[in-house]
Regions:
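Catalytic cores of glycan-processing enzymes that make or break glycosidic bonds
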Residues: 1-125
């Protein structure tokens, strides 16, 4: 019975709605994009519908890349050199602490970043 509910849940939230999200995006976003000369950036972070990368590619909406929030669950930090050409790289979002706040709030994590990503030796400042 539990598997049946899980299957229903997964189908409803991750498959059935994917087409709905894409149809709505392709109907609404072009008008918004055509109304300005500004570059659009999508906050494609966290759990997003599977159609989001495809829609963003088709509409040439820039991806948002945050080094301390890699899109791959296997990574702790991302490498900006690997980001897509059509992307914006930032140190955080409105949902995260400031760069300084992040650096100070978890010394273990900032030490890891200092050594593994910045390739620096000694104690992190």
């Amino acid at each position: 019975m539990k598997d049946a509910y899980n299957n229903l849940y997964n189908d409803f939230f991750y498959h059935r709605h994917n087409g709905f999200w894409k149809d709505c995006a392709m109907r609404k976003l072009p008008a918004l994009l055509d109304s300005t000369r500004m570059l659009a950036c999508g906050e494609d972070l966290g759990m997003i519908p599977a159609c989001v990368p495809e829609v963003m590619r088709e509409l040439r909406i820039l991806s948002l890349e945050i080094q301390r929030m890699p899109k791959s669950p296997e990574k702790t930090f991302d490498d900006p050199a690997t980001y897509p050409y059509l992307s914006v790289c930032a140190t955080g979002t409105h949902d995260t602490s400031t760069l300084r706040g992040w650096w100070e709030e978890d010394r273990q994590m900032s030490e890891r970043f200092f050594h593994e990503t910045l390739h620096c030796e000694g104690q992190a400042p």
